[in-house]
From Swiss-Prot:
The keyword Heme does not apply. Belongs to the EPSP synthase family. This is 3-phosphoshikimate 1-carboxyvinyltransferase. One of its GO terms (molecular function) is 3-phosphoshikimate 1-carboxyvinyltransferase activity. One of its GO terms (biological process) is chorismate biosynthetic process. InterPro entries: Enolpyruvate_Tfrase_dom (IPR001986), Enolpyruvate_Tfrase_sf (IPR036968), EPSP_synthase (IPR006264), EPSP_synthase_CS (IPR023193), RNA3'P_cycl/enolpyr_Trfase_a/b (IPR013792). 3-phosphoshikimate binds at residues 22-23, 27, 169-171, 197, 313, 336, 340. Monomer. Transmembrane segments: none annotated. It catalyses: 3-phosphoshikimate + phosphoenolpyruvate = 5-O-(1-carboxyvinyl)-3-phosphoshikimate + phosphate.
Amino acid sequence: MESLTLQPIARVDGTINLPGSKSVSNRALLLAALAHGKTVLTNLLDSDDVRHMLNALAALGVSYTLSADRTRCEIIGNGGSLHAEGALELFLGNAGTAMRPLAAALCLGSNDIVLTGEPRMKERPIGHLVDALRLGGAKITYLEQENYPPLRLQGGFTGGNVDVDGSVSSQFLTALLMTAPLAPEDTVIRIKGDLVSKPYIDITLNLMKTFGVEIENQHYQQFVVKGGQSYQSPGTYLVEGDASSASYFLAAAAIKGGTVKVTGIGRNSMQGDIRFADVLEKMGATICWGDDYISCTRGELNAIDMDMNHIPDAAMTIATAALFAKGTTTLRNIYNWRVKETDRLFAMATELRKVGAEVEEGHDYIRITPPEKLNFAEIATYNDHRMAMCFSLVALSDTPVTILDPKCTAKTFPDYFEQLARIS
């Protein structure tokens, strides 16, 4: 297996121009495909997950052109739901941001489409979304294991009263929200359980509004969506920088700055993961906010005990930053780590122990006490981009670290290690 050994990094300083947000890129691509008119997306992320969405849209007959660096996409909207000519199978890798929204959108009208992906995708639950779509009339068949992809979709979603469990993934609700305006009837979506990762729902609602559709949000407990609507292209749309990707550089500055400035997000960003900067500030770093940047300067870091449900992806970065904080850090309410690219609670606990931390892994929390000195370790990445990027921070100690399968960052940030080297 390929590996990358990072030598100890004495100091970080500089500016990082962030790649586009994965969450925003894939939502914007799908809405642009469903909309009337031509949309030009700029600062689009070029990564595996986005390529899976683009390939699926092409297979569904959507016409688009990409710039040479794949960050500008001109897409001709379909002016309504997407249809395949005959039976079709779409391979979506391990891209949840493609699998979940497409599973819903392709239930409009009549289709015969199979959605499948990598082995890990077949372990990521989708039953709550399927249950909700079936309530709205969709005909969906599990082709292997009940509640998991691959799925056969045969259309039929018309709207109506739909319940969805919000406790596992906000992507199920996102998928329903983006699809419901195109259904023939009105849809009332009721949330069962506690809704996780609420800020990701705000990204969805924000983008839908940009494409001309507003819905009634009743305190995140119920959403009322008028049927028979259509999305309208905004003309051009700039994809924000990826706030989850920003977390590694901001944390590096908190540990070994200097000052690092990330551009492409700022105080008005729609992504909840910008709140990661508040957590670093609470730990002792100095944060400065601009309209299109966030900067972080080193501070004496102290442990925290916090509910991280609002920033589940960026919270992983706090788990490795905790290795450099005084005291025991506890991250709570993060059960949904278990249903991401890998079981991130198990993976994080396992790899933190390798570098010498004392770790308690709970059902939905992790407690981390750093060692006096970090051990050298070979870090397994579980084909999870965030594991690779999080554990690069170990090199900010006086100990090298080896990252196995470093290219797994291609899911969201193909040139991550080059960017880290630029500020080191």
